[in-house]
Amino acid sequence: MRILVLGVGNILLTDEAIGVRIVEALEQRYILPDYVEILDGGTAGMELLGDMANRDHLIIADAIVSKKNAPGTMMILRDEEVPALFTNKISPHQLGLADVLSALRFTGEFPKKLTLVGVIPESLEPHIGLTPTVEAMIEPALEQVLAALRESGVEAIPREAIHD
């Protein structure tokens, strides 16, 4: 079993950092089996090809732009819904992710299961730190990442449970 939890986003553009902040919270607060990798992908694109290839489950946490939904709204997309979303995105890393997913499909290395946990940003202005609206979504989004892991039979162990 090979699972990757990938957080992507630009920490210099306010809410664009949500994906990175979600995986940071996961790594800080939970212990996962060795076959589950957590990766801060930042704004990387094709450089992630090797990391994303041949995964049993790829879970991506990211900010996703939507004109239909209010800032702070969480969206969960699965499998074929994910590449479709990235075909009309605005940020450079999402174009890169679309290319990576296309390349993985072309080479036969597409993940067996793909989950996107996305949060609609309120601001993409240059600034370090999330808006309160999006920061409030770290916890619910983290719960969705944990639920996606459970779907693949992974039970995350809270770090504080180890110290009790």
Swiss-Prot record:
Cite the InterPro entries for this sequence.
Pept_A31_hyd_express, Pept_HybD-like_dom_sf, Peptidase_A31
Gene Ontology BP annotations:
protein processing
Q: Which Pfam families match?
A: HycI (PF01750)
CDD domains in the record, alphabetically?
Answer: H2MP_MemB-H2up
Enzyme Commission no: 3.4.23.-
**Residue numbers binding Ni(2+):** E16, D62, H93
Q: What class of enzyme is it?
A: hydrolase
**Cofactor(s) this protein cannot do without:** Ni(2+)
From the UniProt record, which GO molecular function terms apply?
Answer: aspartic-type endopeptidase activity; endopeptidase activity; enzyme activator activity; metal ion binding
Keyword list, A-Z: Aspartyl protease, Hydrolase, Metal-binding, Nickel, Protease
Q: Does the keyword Secreted apply?
A: no
Give the family, as the similarity comment puts it: Belongs to the peptidase A31 family.
This chain's function reads: Protease involved in the C-terminal processing of HybC, the large subunit of hydrogenase 2. Specifically cleaves off a 15 amino acid peptide from the C-terminus of the precursor of HybC.
Q: Which NCBIfam families match?
A: hupD, hydrog_prot, PRK10466.1
Q: What is this protein called?
A: Hydrogenase 2 maturation protease
Specify the species: Escherichia coli (strain K12)
